[in-house]
């Protein structure tokens, strides 16, 4: 996907594509940024991820499908689709690591990323699920706009500092096959 957007009198080029090993440096920087700025929204620990080797990062790219959103050629957003390896779960997929830089919010980049993920998922699974911080109404509304529905609440799902956060479990059908 590629397109242009005019914002504050400036034309920006937006594009979304699957990330590759060539995107390692930008992907690593974006992921660590997301974990440090919004620790209550991600289960991963920034210090542990920062300590990962390049090979460990690249292994993730080979075991999941990572989409990158670019603004004027700069990686500014990401989302990851993963599929369980167990045969009984092969009809399901998971959405993870959804993040768009503050400067790129409101540009349509998040919508383009989620559309790319849903398009990919619809060719591979029947339903996709995700968890989202129950105190993040903007993210919840975003996922609802993309067809996700809350199906449960996970109390005290994350413990960050001295606070606990609940997560909502959300689900979306992407295929009508039985």
How would you describe each model-predicted region?
Residues 121-131:
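Conserved GNAT acetyl-CoA-binding A-motif
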Residues 64, 165-169:
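Short hydrophobic/aromatic beta-strand or adjacent loop that forms the aromatic wall/cage
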Residues 107, 111, 135-153:
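Conserved active-site alpha-helix within GNAT-family acetyltransferase domains
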Residues 1-22, 29, 33, 168, ...:
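Conserved N-terminal entry element of GNAT/NAT acetyltransferase domains
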């Amino acid at each position: 996907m590629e397109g242009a957007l005019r914002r504050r009198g400036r034309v920006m080029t937006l594009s979304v594509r699957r990330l590759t090993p060539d995107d390692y440096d930008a992907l690593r920087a974006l992921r660590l940024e997301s974990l440090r700025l919004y620790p209550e929204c991600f289960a991963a620990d920034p210090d542990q991820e920062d300590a990962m080797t390049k090979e460990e990062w690249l292994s993730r790219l080979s075991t999941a499908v990572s989409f990158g959103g670019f603004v004027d050629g700069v990686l500014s957003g990401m989302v990851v689709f993963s599929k369980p390896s167990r045969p009984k779960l092969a009809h399901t997929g998971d959405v993870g690591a959804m993040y768009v830089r503050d400067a790129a919010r409101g540009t349509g980049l998040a919508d383009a990323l989620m559309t790319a993920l849903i398009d990919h998922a619809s060719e591979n699974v029947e339903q996709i699920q995700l968890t989202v911080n129950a105190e993040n109404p903007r993210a919840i509304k975003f996922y609802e706009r993309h067809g996700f529905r809350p199906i449960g609440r996970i109390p005290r799902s994350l413990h960050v500092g001295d606070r606990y956060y609940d997560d909502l479990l959300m689900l979306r059908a992407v295929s009508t096959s039985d």
